[in-house]
Amino acid sequence: MANEVILLDFWPSMFGMRTRIALREKGVEFEYREEDLRNKSPLLLQMNPIHKKIPVLIHNGKPVNESIIQVQYIDEVWSHKNPILPSDPYLRAQARFWADFIDKKLYDAQRKVWATKGEEQEAGKKDFIEILKTLESELGDKPYFSGDDFGYVDIALIGFYTWFPAYEKFANFSIESEVPKLIAWVKKCLQRESVAKSLPDPEKVTEFVSELRKKFVPE
Amino acid sequence: MAERSNSEEVKLLGMWASPFSRRIEIALTLKGVSYEFLEQDITNKSSLLLQLNPVHKMIPVLVHNGKPISESLVILEYIDETWRDNPILPQDPYERTMARFWSKFVDEQIYVTAMKVVGKTGKERDAVVEATRDLLMFLEKELVGKDFLGGKSLGFVDIVATLVAFWLMRTEEIVGVKVVPVEKFPEIHRWVKNLLGNDVIKKCIPPEDEHLKYIRARMEKLNIKSA
């Protein structure tokens, strides 16, 4: 069977970054297709008719939607190398729990940090820091979230790092001073080839967010 | 169904009228796992619940041999991986992926959208009903040619989507707003009949009369006009 793998993505998306990393962890060759989200391709609309969102993983013509579901799919289909989820059911449950936490809590919180101003932004910043501290606490003294090996929760979270300078710029704070251990973890992850190749330059992300912010916070 | 070893301790902190709690009971019962149910008063959370789920402080929490697992979809996967009799997720990776997708869809799209009807009237309410119906139509199409979302037997998505069959549809009965009319959603109604024919579902969903009373009381508290 010819393994045809296409990833419909958008370069600054922290969700797309997950799928890029997972594919590279498994050594899977894939065709990256950049989507213009203001002018979505017919393929995107066909492959994700419900959400119409990226990333979409297309494996031998069949779509897999939702980044965190894509990561699990990649882990199961290409199971021979670099396992992403632990094998123990309890540890797997913990990994799924924290990835779910990131999706439900961190994403919404970060949006308030860069897309609002004034009191709303201050409240958003406070929430965001609290969530990062919860994650830092979960990481503890482990090198990675599941222990010794880079895995599911690391993949779920690391892409947000590329947006950190934008948060710091627009909300005027230092993330490293709030969660130093988490930043040390970031640096360790960045040494991984799969991560380094999959994450965009944070400066470019900041430029992107600057433009985006103008739509939400007219100056 | 054979009972598990006596050394195994399975506790479920839940709430009798919660769809997220009941789905865990369905999975455990389907697997023949004995468990102790600990009813929680969600207006006055026990110190045990706060200890076991310090992040979200929500039910359900499954405690298996002293270890807590939270978030109903996470718990369901844990149950399926731990007790392998009567698998509820498909074996094929792609089919399994689709089951995860539809389950997330039920909880994060259908449920979240339908809940917005609370406190709304007139055109605003109509808009929420329309949005909910649009989402339900995807489920309707997914059901064509199947007895259950899991195919020929009860599966993961059926268990998750009892939320639609017995919470959403019972709530519309109380509120008097037709969200799932049979003429628009014949497959969903057929599916609900099939669910009601399943012994585990019948045993595990809240008794209808009590549940309707509970929903009515809750809706009145939220100032929703009853039909």
UniProtKB/Swiss-Prot annotation, chain A:
EC number(s) per entry: 2.5.1.18
Catalytic activity of the protein: RX + glutathione = an S-substituted glutathione + a halide anion + H(+)
Keyword field: Cytoplasm, Detoxification, Oxidoreductase, Peroxidase, Phosphoprotein, Stress response, Transferase
Induction remark: By dehydration stress, salicylic acid, ethylene, methyl jasmonate, auxin, H(2)O(2), copper, benoxacor, isothiocyanates and the pathogen Hyaloperonospora parasitica.
GO BP annotations, alphabetical order: cellular response to water deprivation; glutathione metabolic process; response to oxidative stress; toxin catabolic process
Keyword set includes Transferase: yes
Modification Phosphoserine, positions: 198
Binding site for glutathione: 13-14, 39-40, 53-54, 66-67
Stretches assigned to the GST C-terminal domain: 88-208
A Gene Ontology cellular-component term: mitochondrion
GO function terms (MF aspect): glutathione binding; glutathione transferase activity; peroxidase activity
UniProt superkingdom: Eukaryota
Subcellular location: Cytoplasm, Cytosol
Primary site of residence: cytoplasm
GST N-terminal domain span: 3-82
Family, per entry: Belongs to the GST superfamily. Tau family.
Function (record text): Catalyzes the glutathionylation of 12-oxophytodienoate (OPDA). In vitro, possesses glutathione S-transferase activity toward 1-chloro-2,4-dinitrobenzene (CDNB) and benzyl isothiocyanate (BITC), and glutathione peroxidase activity toward cumene hydroperoxide.
Protein name: Glutathione S-transferase U19
Species annotation: Arabidopsis thaliana
UniProtKB/Swiss-Prot annotation, chain B:
Any single biological process term in GO: toxin catabolic process
Domain GST N-terminal: residue ranges: 8-87
Entry binding sites for glutathione: 18-19, 44-45, 58-59, 71-72
Enzyme nomenclature, EC number: 2.5.1.18
GO cellular component entries: cytoplasm; cytosol
Coiled-coil annotated spans: none
Protein name: Glutathione S-transferase U7
Native organism: Arabidopsis thaliana
Lineage: Eukaryota, Viridiplantae, Streptophyta, Embryophyta, Tracheophyta
